[in-house]
A protein has these predicted regions:
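Structural signature of hydrophobic alpha-helical transmembrane segments
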Residues: 39-51, 89-98, 177-191, 243-257
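Hydrophobic, membrane-inserted alpha-helices
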Residues: 26-33, 53, 57, 75-84, ...
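Cytosolic-side transmembrane-helix boundaries in multi-pass membrane proteins
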Residues: 1-21, 292-343
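N-terminal signal-anchor module of multipass membrane proteins
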Residues: 1-61, 338-343
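C-terminal ends of transmembrane helices
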Residues: 7, 55-67, 103-114, 196-205, ...
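Long hydrophobic alpha-helical segments that form multi-pass transmembrane helix bundles
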Residues: 115-195
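Loop-to-transmembrane alpha-helix initiation sites
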Residues: 117-121, 249-257, 278, 296-309
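Membrane-interface helix-loop-helix junctions at boundaries between adjacent transmembrane segments
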Residues: 70-75, 80-151
């Protein structure tokens, strides 16, 4: 059984391994922006995350007595995603614990490459978020001086989350939101860079627009119709059009929404595989994510929503396959009956 699993994983690696390699490359521009805002510490954090993910891969290969696959970048990609979801001031032990949880609990416990039902990076982030919320959800301001090793003395805040949760609007220009010039996780703020990364991954056929766009459109529609800003939900729709659009901007460009649409949603083994299933997957992600943002206690509710929807993505695939087979069997039966009647 173990030998059959290893052979299956090797075949899958040849088909989907490029996805994780491209994800690692797309981390580079986000990391460059993060270093521009926060200094060299993000580079060191990502380096440690990469090293921990790689060492876990080698250790598991040794324990399971299988050959280490140097072309398998899945652990490293999960580790880098977790690092980019963290603030630049996060303590080292929190980052290491998150990567270990994501790689070992989120991936290897279920059998390793391609066998996991939940996105390992989301698993690692959620474990850290629940265990150390004061470390994960409080962010330094851009251009702050952050020491390389001990960042405990740096001023941090959760202004964005507090403002939106209290029904206020962000006093941040669209350009600043697009560039990521606000307190946020170190790799999720630069919306313009994220769009460019998404376009590259789409050209490489690593992400599917059916899941990404349905997620973003669903989230935008819910926020537009039911904004949490004070007073907007009571006034006429057209009278508050500009303010509602601003609410959509604030919600989609904060809270790692765009980052998740590019780097988390289209993971090959946790996303639905058929087009209709991916659309439904994205719609459910949008509904559950906005629900977590509106009524949850954590700013980056999208990772919690991802785990919820991952639990039924396989069921959506199976349901679509059965419906497709049923419809085509009826169509074929009708065609056969028509031919017999004509004869």
């Amino acid at each position: 059984m173990e030998e059959a699993l290893i052979q299956w994983q090797e075949r899958e690696l040849t088909q989907t391994g490029h996805y994780y390699k491209h994800i690692c490359w797309m981390v580079v521009p986000l990391l460059w922006m993060s270093c521009y805002f926060y200094g060299p510490r993000p580079l060191l954090l990502c380096g440690v995350a990469w090293l921990v993910g790689n060492l876990c891969d080698r250790l598991i290969s040794l324990l399971r007595r299988r050959v280490y696959q140097p072309k398998d970048y899945s652990n490293e990609s999960f580790a880098l995603i977790i690092a980019l979801l963290m603030p630049a001031t996060v303590d080292w032990y929190v980052l290491v614990a998150a990567v270990l949880a994501g790689v070992l609990i989120g991936k290897e416990v279920f059998g390793g490459y391609g066998s996991y039902p939940f996105h390992p990076a989301a698993v690692g982030f959620v474990v850290a978020a629940v265990s150390w919320p004061e470390q994960v959800f409080r962010y330094p301001q851009p251009y702050a001086s952050i020491p390389l090793w001990d960042a405990s003395g740096v001023a941090v805040s959760s202004t964005i989350s507090d403002t939106l949760r209290s029904g206020g609007t962000l006093n941040i220009s669209t350009l600043s939101l697009g560039l990521g010039e606000y307190a946020a996780p170190m790799g999720t703020g630069a919306a313009l860079v994220l769009v460019a990364c998404g376009l590259f991954l789409w050209v490489q056929k690593d992400i599917r627009l059916s899941a990404t766009l349905s997620f973003l459109i669903t989230s935008a529609v819910i926020v537009f119709l039911f904004p949490r800003q004070v007073g907007l939900d009571n006034g006429p729709l057209l009278m508050n059009l500009a303010f509602r659009l601003r609410c959509v901007r604030d919600e989609l460009l904060t809270g790692a929404m765009l980052f998740s649409a590019v780097f988390l949603l289209n993971e090959p083994y946790t996303c639905a595989h058929h087009r209709l299933g991916r659309i439904l997957y994205g719609v459910l992600m949008g509904v559950v994510t906005v629900g977590f943002r509106y009524f949850g206690v954590y700013e980056t509710g999208v990772c919690f929503a991802l785990l919820v929807v991952n639990s039924i993505s396989g069921w959506m695939d199976r349901t679509e396959t059965h419906l497709y087979a049923l419809l085509h069997s009826r169509k074929n039966a009708g065609d056969t009956a028509g031919k017999e009647g004509a004869e």
